[in-house]
Each structure stands twice: as structure tokens, then as C-alpha cells.
């Protein structure tokens, strides 16, 4: 069908539609059956075809004039759904011959699509079944609602070529009445929806005005009936709206009356909750009384039957511990549920489980008697003396070594500590007279006497270590004395440490009448004595006065080389007294003539005195030994201390000059030679 062939459709196309409110921007789409059409939503051509099918089914036997409304409705729908971009051809024309009623276009809404086979089976093969995606109703925006409200408030009759606006009812614009009954409200909503569908399905309900102002009405009989029903339904709503206008006081009274029953209900609900809690609390109290009223005596084996499987709330536990089902350190109730199953299965273990139950209760103790620090017994009131367990062995001091195998225990009457009978002390024989002397043991108690009289294996190792350390120190001293590198200063210091009383640690070297030297008995080492009769080497043992330790002699190659070197140097500087920088400087006394045996007394210094009378050479090196750090050599002047060559006293020079038989001229030569060297080197005279 072509709308341009019909004069009525041409006039409708010439009419300009009223200005529509701006719609939100939507993307335009095209239809597969009508690719040239651009629209938003669904295709208007397809909609016109559907409406034409409906008109043909409803008005199949009517005249040709009755078929005009579908063509007009198709033109109106195309004008509505096409994008308004071509205003020159079919756009807005306010000065046309006729105008379409403005209240018509906002009222158009989509309806549910259905197949043509429902109405007429003859058209089932012509039209395809429609998709249900196009059945969604278009939502009315807020702008459309405002425009509908403005149109509804306009005057109903306008003359002079104006548009006659008839008020129409819309479910969106009209207020919805609140009904207390939900069933009635649902039924009313369904009826209103059916009325809306019937109202908006009829698309031929519109009015057109001519130039002369005559109204051209094109409507069917069914449309008139629908309007009458709607108008009849509107009248009672207006009456209800007038009746609802009441003062505020009435609303307050009504609200108070409605709230009173709710308060009553809340009170009864709170009372019921409180009664339930009170009932639970009473039940818990009864369970506690039953549990605490049981017999908790140690000898009782009766179990509380009322105790449930789950653990009950204890007085010393919190609610968190109840949910954790774990035992706390502050539990006071015994546990019966764990061992209850064993009573029925194993009768032989019945007594053992009873003991476990009683031991699990901290208020009753079945511990065995044990010794405490003060000697009392713990738990001895629970059993008679005959039923008590034997006490544990006594707590002895820490013994690192194994104790002796034989012990004589004496059982005490109070059953507390075993006591060892003290063994008689062994007799000690005095070595001086061979008579056994009584042993005096320190300490007044038996334990200290046992400690001192017992063997060293029973003593603590701390004292053994201390005594062994003393022995090791003494052995080290002996080893140091045996070494050939020991000096006289170290020997004298050891002698002073040992406690020997000597006059300023001095020793005398005396000359006999025959020219030989007599040495004290404490001098250690080799002695080479050269006499006029024979050249013999006398070797004898030195000994310590206090310690009583005998040291063997030790002659080393190193000593011999050192002594030979010193002898060689003394021959060059004969008769000189050699001193180190650290040595003391006492006066040297030479009494008597050369044969009279001069006497020299020395202090804490190393003295090497040589007599050159009668060709006899005597080397005294009893304690003339030096360490590696202090020994010196004529070849190595940097190693060791410097040597000062000093002369004898004047008296000794004079005596040596007038020397007797043993002196000779050798002594004067040595003294004069030493004096000349001292004068030339030291510049002292």
C-alpha cells in the first residue's frame, strides 16, 4: 500500500506534527526487510504491516471507507518513528490545511506482538512469526510525563481553528490509590494493564481538523466503548481524592491508633523472649546442682548419669572456652566422660580408671609420699603407715666418680634418710719415729669427716684439679731448672720463692791457702777447679734447702760452648770484674796477699772472678748463666747488654802489685791492663 495514492493520507502527511520534547540520543538501526529505513527501536514499516493485518481481521466485511484508517495510522507511525531530519519535505508544517491532534502521538506505545495464525489461519503462511525481543514496552521519561501533565491541564475546548484537547487517562500520569488489601491491589493492577493494552492497541483513535474547523473523527465503535469505561472509572477516583482531604489532626489520631497494636505485639514478643531465656537459665541451674551434688569422695566409683556427652559450663571458664572444647588450667571439675566407656568394656581396668578419675580432680591427691626439703612427707595423711610406699633414696651431693661398692646403711626410725656408718680412719705412721700418730680430721660433723677420710675418688674434681695444678706447677719449675738456659737470676728468684732464708741472697766464694776455691754447698752445676798439683774436674750435686728436691746434673753442649767463649774472652781481659748494666755495684774487697786467698763477697749479680797467680786458671761459673736475651758475646755487641770494663779497687791493685806466692806479676798486669782499657774506652779517669 502506498500512502501517497490516498488523498486523506496525503493530507495527513502534509500536516505537521506537534513539537516533540527532545528525546535522548540513540543509535539508528536498519531492518533486514527494509534496509532503506533508518529508525530507532524497531522498524516502523514492519509495525504498519502488523497494524494493517489487525485492521483487516477486525474489519474484514466493511466498506472501502472503513479501510482508510489503517493507511492514516501507517502514515502517522512512519512520521513518528522516522528521524526528523527532512523538514523540507515531510517535516514540521504548522500552516498546513489540517493538523493531527497532539494528544495522539504521546499515547502511542508498543504492544505485545503475536502471530497472525492466532487471529486468522489464512495468513499463517504469509507472515513470519515475530521475535519476542521487540515486545519490550518503551519507558516513558520524566520529560514525557511533564508534557503529558501540561497537555492535561490545558482548556478542554478551543475555537478558531485550534486543537480540541480531550483529557485522556494514563496509568503513568494518574496517581495510584493505595489499598490495604494486597489481593485487591493486584487485581486492580491487572485490570488497569488490560485496559491500557486494549486502549493502546486501537491505533485508529485520532481526530483531524479541516480548514473550516470541522472535526473529522475516524474511530470505531469499540474505541468509544473503551473511553466510556475509562471515564466511569475516573469518576470515583475524583470522589476519593476529595474525601481524602482531611486535617492533620485526623491523620495523627489514625497513626496513633495504628501504632498501639504494634507496641502491644512488641511487648508480648519481648516477654516471650525473656521467658525463654529464664527457662534456659533454670535448666542450666538444675544441671549444675545435679552435677555438683554428686559424690566426689576419693573411694567412690559412681559416675553422674545426668552428665551429658558435651562438656558443661564450669564456674571458672569463660564462654569462649566452652566453644573451644579445650581444657583450661583453671578447671576444677574432674573428667569422667573419657574413661566412662572403659568401665563397661574392660572390667579388669576398672580400678585403674577410678584412680585416674580421682587423680584428675586437683582437689584430692593420691600422690605417693615423697621427701621434701624440710624432711616432711607429702600426702602421708591419706594412707596408714603400713600402706605407705618406701621413700626414695636420699639426695646426695654430686659425685662425679662411681661410689665405692660397699655401703653399710643404717635404717632410721623416722623412715626419712639412710645414713652411712662412718668408717674408722686409717692409722698414719710417723716417719720420724715409726709410731702411729692419731689423725686429726677437720670438721665437727660426720659428713665432713667422711669427706676427708674417704678416698680421692669420692671427692669432687674441683679440689683434685687445684691440687694437680699445684703439682704441675712444681714439675714445671723442675723442668725449667733442668734446662741449660736457666740464668742465675731465675734460680735465685726460685730460691727466694721456695722460702729459703739467705742473707740478701748472697753467697761467698772463698779461696783456700793452696789457691783453690771452696764453694758453698748450694751452688748448682759443673765446677772446673785448676790447682797446682793436678787438673781435675769436680762434679757434685746441688741441692735445695727447703723443697728437698734433688736435681740431676745436666751438662749441655751449649753450656760448654758458652763457657769456652767466656774463658777465651777472660784471658784477653784477665782479672777483670764484668758487670752488666742491670747489675748492682757493691764494693769488691780483696783481703790478704796473692797467696792469702782474697775474699770476695757479692750481691745479686753475676760475678766471674778469675785468679791468674802461678799460671793456675780457675773458672767459677756456678751461677753465671744468662738467658738468650741477656747473654752476650764479644762478636755481637748489639745482642744483649753492653759491658763496662771497670778496674778493681785501689787496695786490690796495691795488694796485687805486692802479691805473694800465688799472686805473681800476672795479677798486676791484669789490673793495669784493665785500668788502661777502662781509661781509654770509658774515659772515667
UniProtKB/Swiss-Prot annotation:
Disordered as annotated region, ranges: 1-34, 152-202, 280-314, 419-471, 584-640
Metal-binding recorded as keyword: no
Coiled-coil region: 549-578
Post-translational modification: Phosphorylation at Ser-318 amplifies the promotion of protophloem differentiation.
Tissue spec. comment: Expressed in provascular cells and phloem initials (e.g. protophloem, metaphloem, sieve element precursor cells and sieve element procambium precursor cells).
Sequence ranges of Low complexity compositional bias: 601-611
GO biological process: cell differentiation; cotyledon vascular tissue pattern formation; phloem development; phloem transport; regulation of root development; root system development
Disulphides: none
Keyword NAD: no
Biased composition (Acidic residues): 179-202
Span of the signal peptide: none
Effect of residue 318 to A: Reduced activity. Normal plasma membrane localization. Complements the ops mutant
Domain of life per record: Eukaryota
Cellular component terms (Gene Ontology): apical plasma membrane; chloroplast; cytoplasm
Entry membrane topology: Peripheral membrane protein
Subcellular localization, as worded in the UniProt entry: Cell membrane; Cytoplasm
Location of Phosphoserine modifications: 318
Phenotype caused by lack of the gene: Short roots associated with both reduced cell division in the root meristem and altered root cell elongation. Early emergence of lateral roots at the root-hypocotyl junction. Reductions in the complexity of vascular networks in cotyledons and discontinuous phloem differentiation. Impaired primary root protophloem differentiation during root development leading to altered phloem long-distance transport. The double mutant vcc ops exhibits a complete loss of high-complexity vascular networks.
Basic residues composition-biased segments: 280-291
Alphabetically ordered keywords of this record: Cell membrane, Coiled coil, Cytoplasm, Developmental protein, Differentiation, Membrane, Phosphoprotein
Reported effect, residue 318 to K: Slightly increased activity. Normal plasma membrane localization. Complements the ops and brx mutants. Strongly increased activity
Subunit structure: Interacts with VCC.
Function: Potentiates primary root protophloem differentiation. Required, together with VCC, for embryo provasculature development and cotyledon vascular complexity and connectivity. Regulates roots architecture. Mediates the recruitment of ASK7/BIN2 to the plasma membrane.
Family in the record: Belongs to the OCTOPUS family.
Name the record gives this protein: Protein OCTOPUS
Organism the protein comes from: Arabidopsis thaliana
Taxonomic lineage: Eukaryota, Viridiplantae, Streptophyta, Embryophyta, Tracheophyta
Protein's gene: OPS
Amino acid at each position: 500500500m502506498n500512502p501517497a495514492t490516498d488523498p486523506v493520507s496525503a493530507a495527513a502527511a502534509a500536516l505537521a506534527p506537534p513539537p516533540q520534547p527532545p528525546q535522548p540520543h540513540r543509535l539508528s538501526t536498519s531492518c533486514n526487510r527494509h534496509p532503506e529505513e533508518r529508525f530507532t527501536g524497531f522498524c516502523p514499516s514492519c509495525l504498519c504491516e502488523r497494524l494493517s493485518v489487525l485492521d483487516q481481521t477486525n474489519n474484514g466485511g466493511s466498506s472501502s471507507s472503513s479501510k482508510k484508517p489503517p493507511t492514516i495510522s501507517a502514515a502517522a507511525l512512519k512520521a513518528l518513528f522516522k528521524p526528523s531530519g527532512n523538514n523540507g519535505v515531510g517535516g514540521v508544517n504548522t500552516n498546513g490545511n489540517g493538523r493531527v491532534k497532539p494528544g495522539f502521538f504521546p499515547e502511542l506505545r508498543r504492544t505485545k506482538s503475536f502471530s497472525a495464525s492466532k487471529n486468522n489461519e489464512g495468513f499463517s503462511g504469509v507472515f513470519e512469526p515475530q521475535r519476542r525481543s521487540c515486545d519490550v514496552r518503551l519507558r516513558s521519561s520524566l520529560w514525557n510525563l511533564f508534557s503529558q501533565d501540561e497537555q492535561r491541564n490545558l482548556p478542554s475546548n478551543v475555537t478558531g481553528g485550534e486543537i480540541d484537547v480531550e483529557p485522556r487517562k494514563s496509568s503513568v500520569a494518574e496517581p495510584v490509590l493505595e489499598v490495604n488489601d494486597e489481593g485487591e491491589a493486584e487485581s486492580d493492577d491487572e485490570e488497569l494493564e488490560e485496559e491500557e493494552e486494549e486502549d493502546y492497541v486501537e491505533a485508529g483513535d485520532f481526530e483531524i481538523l479541516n480548514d473550516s474547523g470541522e472535526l473529522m473523527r475516524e474511530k470505531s465503535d469499540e474505541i468509544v466503548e473503551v473511553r466510556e469505561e475509562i471515564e466511569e472509572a475516573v469518576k470515583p477516583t475524583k470522589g476519593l481524592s476529595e474525601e481524602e482531604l482531611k486535617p492533620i489532626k485526623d491523620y495523627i489520631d489514625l497513626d496513633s491508633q495504628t501504632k498501639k497494636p504494634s507496641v502491644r505485639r512488641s511487648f508480648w514478643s519481648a516477654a516471650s523472649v525473656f521467658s525463654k531465656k529464664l527457662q534456659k537459665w533454670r535448666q542450666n541451674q538444675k544441671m549444675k546442682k545435679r552435677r555438683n551434688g554428686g559424690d566426689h569422695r576419693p573411694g567412690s566409683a559412681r559416675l553422674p548419669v545426668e552428665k551429658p556427652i558435651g562438656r558443661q559450663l564450669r564456674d571458672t571458664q569463660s564462654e569462649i572456652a566452652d566453644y573451644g572444647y579445650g581444657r583450661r588450667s583453671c578447671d576444677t571439675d574432674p573428667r569422667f566422660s573419657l574413661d566412662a566407656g572403659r568401665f563397661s568394656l574392660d572390667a579388669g581396668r576398672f580400678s585403674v580408671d577410678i584412680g585416674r578419675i580421682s587423680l584428675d580432680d586437683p582437689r584430692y591427691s593420691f600422690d605417693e609420699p615423697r621427701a621434701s626439703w624440710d624432711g616432711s612427707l607429702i600426702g602421708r595423711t591419706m594412707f596408714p603407715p603400713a600402706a605407705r610406699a618406701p621413700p626414695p633414696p636420699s639426695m646426695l651431693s654430686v659425685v662425679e666418680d662411681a661410689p665405692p661398692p660397699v655401703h653399710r646403711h643404717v635404717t632410721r626410725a623416722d623412715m626419712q634418710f639412710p645414713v652411712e656408718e662412718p668408717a674408722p680412719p686409717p692409722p698414719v705412721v710417723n716417719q720420724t719415729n715409726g709410731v702411729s700418730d692419731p689423725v686429726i680430721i677437720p670438721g665437727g660433723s660426720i659428713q665432713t669427716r667422711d669427706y676427708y677420710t674417704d678416698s680421692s675418688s669420692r671427692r669432687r674434681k674441683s679440689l683434685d684439679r687445684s691440687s694437680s695444678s699445684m703439682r704441675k706447677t712444681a714439675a714445671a719449675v723442675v723442668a725449667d731448672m733442668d734446662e741449660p738456659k736457666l740464668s742465675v737470676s731465675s734460680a735465685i728468684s726460685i730460691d727466694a720463692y721456695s722460702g729459703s732464708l739467705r742473707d740478701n741472697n748472697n753467697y761467698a766464694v772463698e779461696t783456700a791457702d793452696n789457691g783453690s776455691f771452696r764453694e758453698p754447698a748450694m751452688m748448682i752445676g759443673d765446677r772446673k777447679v785448676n790447682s797446682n798439683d793436678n787438673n781435675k774436674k769436680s762434679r757434685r750435686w746441688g741441692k735445695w734447702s727447703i723443697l728437698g728436691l734433688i736435681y740431676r746434673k745436666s751438662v749441655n753442649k751449649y753450656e760448654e760452648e758458652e763457657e769456652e767463649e767466656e774463658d777465651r774472652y777472660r784471658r784477653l781481659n784477665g782479672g777483670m770484674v764484668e758487670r752488666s748494666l742491670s747489675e748492682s755495684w757493691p764494693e769488691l774487697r780483696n783481703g790478704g796477699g796473692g797467696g792469702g786467698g782474697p775474699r770476695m763477697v757479692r750481691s745479686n749479680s753475676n760475678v766471674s772472678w778469675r785468679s791468674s797467680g802461678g799460671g793456675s786458671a780457675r773458672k767459677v761459673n756456678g751461677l753465671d748463666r744468662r738467658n738468650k736475651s741477656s747473654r752476650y758475646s764479644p762478636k755481637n755487641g748489639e745482642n744483649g747488654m753492653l759491658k763496662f770494663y771497670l778496674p778493681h779497687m785501689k787496695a786490690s791493685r796495691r795488694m796485687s802489685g805486692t802479691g805473694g806466692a800465688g799472686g805473681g806479676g800476672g795479677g798486676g798486669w791484669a789490673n793495669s791492663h784493665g785500668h788502661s782499657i777502662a781509661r781509654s774506652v770509658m774515659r772515667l779517669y
